[in-house]
C-alpha cells in the first residue's frame, strides 16, 4: 500500500503540473506516431478509449476490428487510477497497458483521470486527446437497440448527435431519433456531440466512427471477482490468454497489485480541509453539517440524495485526490498538456 500511496501522490502532482501547462511534447509524440505508422505501412491512425479493467474478449474483439483499419492506439485512463465509476481500478494503468500491447495494440497512451471528473469533462478530454493523436478512425462497440440504429445511420451520414433527457436527436436534420440509450451506446452519442461542440477548436480534424456490435456473455464484475479469488478457471472463457498470463506472472503476489482506496486520505480531507475548494457547493455544504467523520460510509450517507452511486464514488475520489476545482478546470482547459506513452509496464514521457 505504501508504494501505491507514493504513486497516487506522484499522479496528483502530475495533474497539478499539467494544469499549469509548463511544457508540451505533443509535436514530438505526433512525429513518433507518424514514424510508427510508416513503419507498419498503416493507412489510418485508429484511436480507441477503453479502461481495460481488465482487458477481456470484448475489448480484444473491438481491437481486432479497429486494427483492420490502421495503426491502433489505445488510450487508457489515467492518473490516480480511479475509474469512471469513481472506484479504484483492479490494477494500475501500466499493467493494463501491458495487457493492451500483448492483445495487439500498436501503442498505448495515457488518458485523463476519469475518477475525479464528470462525464462531460472527461469526454471533452477524450476528444481533445483523440485530436492531438491525429486519430482518423474511432472504433466503437455498440449494443443493438432501435434508437442506436438510428444514431449510427445519422453518424454514418456525416451528422452529429445531440443528447438531452428523453430526446436523442440529429443536430443537422433536427430529427428526433429516440428518447433513451443504453449507457454504452450513450457514450457513442456523447462522443459525437462533443466532437461537434469542439469542432471550432479542430477545424481540420474530421474523424470517422466505425461501429461493430458488441459480443455477449462477458461480465466485468464476474471477471474481477475471479481475479480477486485467483480463480481463473471460472473466467478463462471471457479473457484472452494474454490477459490471464499477465495476472499469472505475478504468482503468489497477485493480491499485492490489486488497487485499494486510501481511506485515511479521504477522512483527513473531509475532517481537516476546506471542502468548498474540492467539491460542488451543494455537496460541501451538506458534508460540513457533520463535524467529524469516522468512516467512508458515514461520508456517503451525508452526500445529498439524488446522486448516483457513481457520482458518490467520484465524490470520494475527489476527497482522496484533494485537487482544487480550479486546478481541475485548468487541467481540462490545457488538456492534453503532454502525451504520455505507456510502453508495457514502463511510463515514458
From Swiss-Prot:
Transmembrane segments: none annotated. This is Uncharacterized protein MMP1471. InterPro entries: HIGH_NTase1_ass, Rossmann-like_a/b/a_fold, tRNA(Met)_cyd_acetate_ligase. Gene3D superfamilies: 1.20.58.620, HUPs. Belongs to the TmcAL family.
Amino acid at each position: 500500500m505504501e508504494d501505491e500511496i507514493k504513486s497516487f501522490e506522484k499522479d496528483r502532482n502530475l495533474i497539478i503540473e499539467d494544469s499549469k501547462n509548463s511544457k508540451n511534447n505533443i509535436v514530438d509524440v505526433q512525429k513518433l506516431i507518424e514514424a510508427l505508422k510508416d513503419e507498419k505501412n498503416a493507412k489510418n491512425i485508429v484511436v480507441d478509449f477503453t479502461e481495460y479493467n481488465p482487458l477481456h474478449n470484448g475489448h480484444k474483439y473491438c481491437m481486432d476490428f479497429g486494427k483492420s483499419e490502421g495503426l491502433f492506439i489505445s488510450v487508457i485512463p489515467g492518473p490516480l487510477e480511479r475509474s469512471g465509476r469513481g472506484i479504484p481500478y483492479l490494477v494500475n494503468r501500466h499493467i493494463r497497458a501491458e495487457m493492451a500491447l500483448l492483445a495487439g495494440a500498436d501503442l498505448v497512451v495515457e488518458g485523463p483521470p476519469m475518477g475525479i471528473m464528470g462525464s462531460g469533462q472527461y469526454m471533452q478530454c477524450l476528444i481533445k486527446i483523440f485530436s492531438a493523436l491525429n486519430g482518423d478512425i474511432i472504433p466503437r462497440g455498440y449494443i443493438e437497440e432501435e434508437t442506436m440504429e438510428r444514431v449510427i445511420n445519422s453518424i454514418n451520414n456525416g451528422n452529429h448527435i445531440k443528447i438531452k433527457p428523453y430526446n436523442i436527436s440529429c443536430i443537422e436534420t433536427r430529427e428526433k431519433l429516440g428518447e433513451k440509450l443504453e449507457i454504452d451506446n450513450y457514450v457513442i452519442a456523447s462522443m459525437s456531440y462533443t466532437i461537434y461542440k469542439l469542432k471550432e477548436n479542430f477545424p481540420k480534424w474530421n474523424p470517422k466512427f466505425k461501429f461493430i456490435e458488441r459480443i455477449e456473455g462477458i461480465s466485468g464484475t464476474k471477471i474481477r471477482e475471479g481475479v480477486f479469488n485467483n480463480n481463473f478457471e471460472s473466467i478463462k472463457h471471457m479473457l484472452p490468454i494474454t490477459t490471464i498470463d499477465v495476472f499469472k506472472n505475478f504468482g503468489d503476489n497477485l493480491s499485492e497489485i490489486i488497487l485499494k482506496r486510501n481511506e485515511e486520505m479521504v477522512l483527513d480531507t473531509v475532517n481537516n480541509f476546506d471542502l468548498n475548494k474540492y467539491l460542488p457547493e451543494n455537496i460541501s455544504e451538506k458534508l460540513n453539517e457533520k463535524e467529524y467523520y469516522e468512516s467512508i460510509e458515514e461520508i456517503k450517507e451525508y452526500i445529498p440524495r439524488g446522486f448516483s452511486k457513481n457520482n458518490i464514488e467520484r465524490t470520494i475520489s475527489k476527497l482522496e485526490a484533494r485537487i482544487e476545482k480550479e486546478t481541475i478546470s485548468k487541467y481540462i482547459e490545457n488538456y492534453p498538456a503532454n502525451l504520455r506513452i505507456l510502453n508495457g509496464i514502463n511510463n515514458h514521457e
